From Swiss-Prot:
Keywords from the named record: Cell wall, Hydrolase, Lipid degradation, Lipid metabolism, Secreted, Serine esterase, Signal
Coiled coil, from the record: none
Predominant subcellular localization, coarse grouping: secreted
GO MF term (any one): carboxylic ester hydrolase activity
E.C. designation(s): 3.1.1.-
Stated name of the protein: GDSL lipase Rv0518
Activity control note: Activity is inhibited by the serine modifier phenylmethylsulfonyl fluoride (PMSF).
Organism: Mycobacterium tuberculosis (strain ATCC 25618 / H37Rv)
Phylogenetic classification of the source organism: Bacteria, Bacillati, Actinomycetota, Actinomycetes, Mycobacteriales
Amino acid sequence: MSRPGTYVIGLTLLVGLVVGNPGCPRSYRPLTLDYRLNPVAVIGDSYTTGTDEGGLGSKSWTARTWQMLAARGVRIAADVAAEGRAGYGVPGDHGNVFEDLTARAVQPDDALVVFFGSRNDQGMDPEDPEMLAEKVRDTFDLARHRAPSASLLVIAPPWPTADVPGPMLRIRDVLGAQARAAGAVFVDPIADHWFVDRPELIGADGVHPNDAGHEYLADKIAPLISMELVG
């Protein structure tokens, strides 16, 4: 998908402040507005696509995040490639893994690539943990190759209760190790207790966020993206 070209418009407004009577000299304060578009790619699963439980269209965490950032003066040109049931090593509804989605979404001028997920990698062979590590490494390598100057933000999958199954912890640990090896910023929602004791944020299926859950995700993720783009 093509995205609008990045451009910068520097606009300086001179604001006159009158001191005393009209005959007095005026002082001026320059105001600079920065209209850069920050190109960002997002790779994810059904937590990003949204589901019947919530988060479809403008109610997705991505759409909410772009709105929140725009309100803070950070404008985003995004390519979002997400697929239900997909992971780094497990194909999704249309047969794609995260590496395929990376090839589709990441562009040479990207400033940031965000990876979110995936709990779907529980479906990989637990007897061969190196297979997942290899899939993750290949995905990050592809992102680096396609967007050499981009920062990578890797967000491991959350779990909605404090009782986290072993396979999820292994996925988290693999992602953390590979993110550090790739020089990426790693975020651990399990350690940070995202969604824990917040059942009102999860849909009736007990798995996917509802609309309020997507708003919660945007509140968590928008500052992370802002930090990578503007510090």
